[in-house]
Regions:
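A structural signal for the principal folded core domain
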Residues: 1-295
């Protein structure tokens, strides 16, 4: 159908002119969450090479204690040359100077198709199905992350598009806010601040205030709320925050005072919270530097 819309078009009716016309259309890009990006593009979005922009030029590394791939400090090479953060050896990966690093080459659609895909020659979508993970190809996970050739490459104009896939903002905002709130409120089992992450911080970063001490205890960090501050935040959202009718759902219903957390927040709730509450709601509850970073 997409091929037909581009090449021959379909008959449509113009009400204002009371006549038929030939309607043609083009698929400019896809919009999805990050896991669905894999299915649509053919590039697997997990593992060391999961970034579809950096591809094999990634700076990701493995966290031995957290047992997962990390992309911390992968983005300083995108800063303008001469930016002071490029030379900062203390606040990012300890001892690392990124002043001479360059971002990966920005590939055109033709380069991706004729150079990257052609060198791997992955199976087509129709041969392996939607996900295409049945058989790993040579070099998969080390040299590339291609698991199939997306059916969208069959569109004659697809290789001429520089931006073919977009990440859904609402999904990203929800994931982002969920992780922030779970860490700020120390939600058991969901906080990113745990013993394993502290051990990895000690290994890779110069942040002695977060290192586990000789007794095996983790110091209380500046980026988490005390019990008093947590209750103050929850009660503020439950009893004091009000929005015009239809602006958002009832955020008060997402407050769980007994367990000290938020639950049941939908994507739009997270969007409203980030846009309207996050810039000021932690001003008196967190350290000023943490609040500025969040807002």
């Amino acid at each position: 159908e997409l091929k037909e819309l581009w090449s021959t078009g379909v008959d449509a009716y113009d009400v204002s002119l009371s006549q038929n016309f030939n309607l043609k259309a083009v698929l400019l890009w896809t919009i999805s969450d990050f896991p669905a990006y894999s299915m649509l593009s053919g590039w697997t979005t997990h593992g060391k090479l999961s970034c579809p922009v950096c591809m094999e030029s990634t700076k990701s590394f493995y966290l031995p204690n957290g047992r997962k791939t990390c992309w911390f400090d992968c983005h300083r090479r995108f800063l303008p040359h001469g930016h002071p953060s490029r030379r900062n050896r203390k606040d990012f990966l300890k001892g690392r100077d990124a002043s001479s690093e360059y971002p990966p080459e920005s590939l055109t659609g033709e380069q991706v198709y004729y150079e990257r895909l052609a060198s791997v020659n992955p199976p087509k979508t129709k041969d392996v199905g939607g996900n295409g993970h049945e058989k790993k190809m040579r070099g998969y996970g080390k040299e590339h992350n291609w698991h199939k050739e997306s059916i969208l490459w069959e569109l004659s104009y697809w290789k001429d598009l520089n931006l073919r896939h977009n990440i859904d903002v609402m999904h990203t905002e929800k994931n982002f806010l969920d992780n922030i709130m779970n860490t700020l409120m120390r939600v058991k089992g969901k906080s990113k601040d745990n013993i394993m992450s502290r051990l990895d911080i000690e290994k890779f970063c110069s942040r002695p205030g977060l290192h586990i001490d000789s007794s095996g205890k983790a110091p209380f960090p500046a980026y988490t709320l005390t019990e008093e501050a947590k209750q103050s935040l929850l009660q503020c959202v439950k009893y004091d925050i009000r929005f015009p009718e239809g602006y958002s759902s009832d955020l008060a219903s997402c407050v769980d005072l007994d367990n000290g957390k938020f639950s049941g927040m939908k994507s739009h709730d997270c969007h409203v919270f980030m846009e309207r509450l996050l810039p000021f709601i932690f001003a008196e509850l967190l350290d000023r530097n943490v609040h500025l970073a969040l807002s």
